[in-house]
Amino acid sequence: MGAARLLPNLTLCLQLLILCCQTQGENHPSPNFNQYVRDQGAMTDQLSRRQIREYQLYSRTSGKHVQVTGRRISATAEDGNKFAKLIVETDTFGSRVRIKGAESEKYICMNKRGKLIGKPSGKSKDCVFTEIVLENNYTAFQNARHEGWFMAFTRQGRPRQASRSRQNQREAHFIKRLYQGQLPFPNHAERQKQFEFVGSAPTRRTKRTRRPQSQT
């Protein structure tokens, strides 16, 4: 009799315990992985091995390639120019990179006035850019320190004021191209002679003698 009376009470206690555990589980927030990715993407990754790529950046506006000739950055280099070869290092496991000229060994950075300059060290945040792949298959580069400021060039290949640049503007659009070095016969004035044909002395044309017509 006593055990039969205790059985309903034990069942009720067990149900209350299960309900309490379910309530605590519902109140505990699930981890936000998207926020975790954003937070980690904003930090420099010191643990993972950095990925290094080499390519050229073709400017949509100038029709030339970005080159680093020291402190000066421009988009006036021809295809295969040694100063147009860029070494791109990943900064995080996301899409942030550091861009360095292979020949000059200077990093592309952006100062507080929004001007592109070359620096020997790329450790500061103003030398980090976020790659943004656009719908038109072009790529834009937003500075990590100055959000909303993009790498951009004018039609003449001069750097444009970053504070006036926007992601949807042609001046901020680039295409990644493989670096294959200079062409064997570049279109240069002093090397035009390599395309000339070997001349030969003109030959005389012999006159064709006509046979006298027979008179009938």
From Swiss-Prot:
Positions bearing carbohydrate: 137
GO biological process, alphabetically ordered: fibroblast growth factor receptor signaling pathway; neurogenesis; positive regulation of cell population proliferation; positive regulation of MAPK cascade; regulation of cell migration
Subcellular location(s) per record: Secreted
Compositionally biased region (Basic residues): 204-216
Span of the signal peptide: 1-22
Main location: secreted
Tissue: Expressed in embryonic brain, mostly in the isthmus cerebellar neuroepithelium and septum neuroepithelium, and in all adult tissues.
Database matches in InterPro entries: Fibroblast_GF_fam, IL1/FGF
Region: Disordered, residue numbers: 195-216
Keyword Secreted among record annotations: yes
Keywords on record: Developmental protein, Glycoprotein, Growth factor, Secreted, Signal
Gene3D superfamilies: 2.80.10.50
Keyword Transmembrane helix recorded: no
One cellular component (GO) term of this entry: extracellular space
CDD domains noted in UniProt: beta-trefoil_FGF17 (cd23323)
GO MF term set: growth factor activity; type 1 fibroblast growth factor receptor binding; type 2 fibroblast growth factor receptor binding
Sequence similarity: Belongs to the heparin-binding growth factors family.
Subunit structure, interactors included: Interacts with FGFR3 and FGFR4.
Function as written in the Swiss-Prot or TrEMBL entry: Plays an important role in the regulation of embryonic development and as signaling molecule in the induction and patterning of the embryonic brain. Required for normal brain development.
Protein name, as recorded: Fibroblast growth factor 17
Organism of origin: Rattus norvegicus (Rat)
